[in-house]
Amino acid sequence: MDKYPFLREAGSSFKDRDVTKMSDLIATWDGQDIKGPALIGVPLSKSSISHSGASFAPGTIRQALKHSSAYSAELGEHVVSELLYDLGDIDIHVTDIVKSHHHIFQTMHALLSDHPDWVPLILGGDNSISYSTIKAIAQTKGTTAVIQFDAHHDVRNTEDGGPTNGTPFRRLLDEEIIEGQHLIQLGIREFSNSQAYEAYAKKHNVNIHTMDMIREKGLIPTIKEILPVVQDKTDFIFISVDMDVLDQSHAPGCPAIGPGGLYTDELLEAVKYIAQQPNVAGIEIVEVDPTLDFRDMTSRAAAHVLLHALKGMKLSPFK
């Protein structure tokens, strides 16, 4: 095409020779051994108890990630040293939620077994996927601590609606896949949960940190206080980020938005801090609904959560 120097690929954006975007560093997985972080999408939203277009989120988060600069001023270099592979999306059954959860577990378990050095960056999807992702992590890695950023406990009973985006941690605790004392819930909000589910979480010794508690003590000090306690009892840490932990002004594209949540910068700093810890097994982002979003604000915030996780991993003295 040298004969037509001003003709370019349809839809292509402005290209600055001095800027490296994440799109320049993200590549389709070639089937080779995976070492370190790599992306995988889980486009499930049928299990949401409210209207949800979270199945579209892996695509919009990817786009927001690709449009971001790869350069971190804090690092003084790109946030990834080599290519960041994208494994694609896990196939979701058209109508069967239970079968979809099995697809997720089976795929994650097989990949983690075959690639023990893989650190999954999971793009949900509604929060129901956490049952399958964390189950796969726990069965392949060992005793796992879960840091759950969420406005809700997500321990609803399964009798009233089956496996939904409100039940993943109930199922994980009931089936003893994780222990309550190894689950840290950060950002639990007022008027977003029931007394029965708070009682269930407390009965199982879940580490609950409400927004009121976080506002009084600070998010990072809270994490610094509780994290060593669970690290001493577990082999790995998994980070689960429900984007509705953010205040509705920061994340309008969530099915269950509400006031009084975390600010984006607080979440980013917290994820970066946790990602610097030893034996981080991965991170998932759930409950982004692009159909409700404004100018992709929530997908952009989710992409920055991933970027700060990558930055934390690169800053880690344990890598």
Curated annotation (Swiss-Prot):
Query: Mind telling me which SUPFAM superfamilies this protein's record contains?
Result: Arginase/deacetylase (SSF52768)
Q: Give cofactor(s), names only.
A: Mn(2+)
Record field: pH dependence: Optimum pH is 8.7.
Q: Could you tell me the keywords of this UniProt record?
A: Histidine metabolism, Hydrolase, Manganese, Metal-binding
MF term (GO), any: agmatinase activity
- EC annotation from Swiss-Prot or TrEMBL: 3.5.3.8
Q: A Pfam family this protein belongs to?
A: Arginase
Q: How is the cofactor bound?
A: Binds 2 manganese ions per subunit. Can also use other divalent cation, with lower efficiency.
Q: One of this protein's GO BP terms?
A: L-histidine catabolic process to glutamate and formamide
User: Do you know which PROSITE patterns this protein is assigned to?
Assistant: ARGINASE_1, ARGINASE_2
| Pathway info | Amino-acid degradation; L-histidine degradation into L-glutamate; L-glutamate from N-formimidoyl-L-glutamate (hydrolase route): step 1/1
Q: What reaction does this catalyse? A: N-formimidoyl-L-glutamate + H2O = formamide + L-glutamate
Q: Binding of Mn(2+) 1: at which residues? A: N127, D150, D154, D242
Chain sites annotated for binding Mn(2+) 2? D150, H152, D242, D244
Q: Which EC class does it fall in? A: hydrolase
Function statement: Catalyzes the conversion of N-formimidoyl-L-glutamate to L-glutamate and formamide.
Check the record and name the NCBIfam families matching this protein. hutG (TIGR01227)
Concerning its family, UniProt says: Belongs to the arginase family.
Q: What is this protein called?
A: Formimidoylglutamase
The record lists the organism as Bacillus subtilis (strain 168)
Q: What is the lineage of its organism?
A: Bacteria, Bacillati, Bacillota, Bacilli, Bacillales
- What is this protein's gene name? hutG
